[in-house]
Regions:
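Amphipathic helical "hinge" segments at domain boundaries
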Residues: 45-112, 117-119, 202
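Short beta-strand segments enriched in small/hydrophobic residues
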Residues: 15-20, 54-70, 181-188
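Bacterial carbohydrate/catabolite-sensing allosteric modules
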Residues: 82-93, 108-114, 131, 138-146, ...
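Short beta->alpha connector loops
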Residues: 69, 100-103, 124-129, 250
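Short gly/ser/thr-rich secondary-structure transition/capping motifs
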Residues: 42-48, 104, 125-126, 256
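N-terminal helix-turn-helix DNA-binding module of bacterial transcription factors
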Residues: 1-60
Length: 294
């Protein structure tokens, strides 16, 4: 394996000059840079990334923590795509760490990325509380950004959407169109998003003067299968409804398929609304109405 000294000899410069060229630190003439890069290419030299990172205190990496229970959804595929593109545009590499199935495992994933010395970390927490996220941010100097949580003490370190208000808007729109019996398929109720969207549904009904009917509420798990199962549960309960809101587009897709299999026409007999405005939504037949959550 070629060494930096061999590169220096081939380029006719010192090891210090080769180091400056490869690290991008300090002035080196373009002619000298060209000779060094040519020598690197000819020799097949590969710099020691660990040594370079220790010297520059930069790894050119961005860490992302997402629990694997969320990988299956279209929304998270799109999220990962956009994060990867952003990282690529900045000339960096993306490192994905799995938060797995508990707050402790999410902590371990964050620590793993910190140990790798990622320049910055993005976290989409599934189990860690707001207070725990605030504590993690305050105990580390590395830039940490939290998605989909409204932090109490570190507002500049989070990006969040008002999930409750989004659900209220969807239900109020249906009420304005004349719907009174509106079914709701929740997301996982052990997640803040699932709880907030259900709360928005209930508040919209109350504001519209519509009594809450618990028989119209079915718990889902964010997947098309649980969306379809939700429609089947409503059928077995023998409750009527003219509109159905699913807490994400994946469940809405499953619900629409099950309604079709039951011979129910969408939107003529039942209007269906989802959340997240996935790329597939307008290509469905009929097109899926969806709330675009920023």
């Amino acid at each position: 394996m070629a060494t930096m000294l061999e590169v220096a000899k081939r380029a006719g410069v010192s090891k210090a000059t080769v180091s400056r060229v490869l690290s991008g630190n300090g002035y080196v003439s373009q002619e000298t840079k060209d000779r060094v890069f040519q020598a690197v290419a000819e020799s097949g030299y590969r710099p020691n990334l660990l040594a370079r990172n220790l010297a520059t205190k930069k790894t050119q990496t961005l860490g992302l923590v997402v629990t694997n229970t969320l990988y299956h959804g279209v929304y998270f595929s799109e999220l990962l795509y956009h994060v990867a593109r952003m990282t690529e545009d900045k000339g960096r590499q993306l490192i994905l760490a799995d938060g797995k199935h508990s707050a402790e495992e999410e902590r371990e994933a964050i620590q793993y990325l910190l140990d790798l010395r990622c320049d910055a970390i993005i976290i989409y927490p599934r189990f860690l509380s707001v207070d725990e996220m605030d504590e993690i941010i305050e105990n580390h100097e590395r830039p940490i950004m939290v998605l989909n949580r409204r932090l109490r003490r570190n507002a500049s370190h989070c990006v969040w959407s008002d999930q409750k208000a989004s659900a209220m808007m969807a239900v109020e729109k249906l009420i304005a169109l004349g719907h009174r019996e509106i079914a709701f398929i929740t997301g996982s109720l052990d997640s803040p998003t699932g709880v907030e969207r259900l709360s928005g549904y209930k508040d919209a009904l109350a504001r519209g003067g519509i009594a809450l009917n618990d028989s119209l509420i079915v718990e889902g798990r964010w997947t098309p299968e649980t969306g379809a199962a939700g429609v089947e549960t409503l059928r077995q309960r023998r409750v009527g409804y003219s509109a159905l809101v699913a807490s994400n587009d994946d469940m809405a897709v499953g619900a629409m398929k099950q309604l079709h299999q039951l011979g129910v026409k969408v939107p003529e007999q039942v209007s269906v609304v989802g959340f997240d405005d996935i790329a597939l939504a307008p290509f469905m037949v009929p097109a899926l109405s969806s709330v675009k959550v920023p």
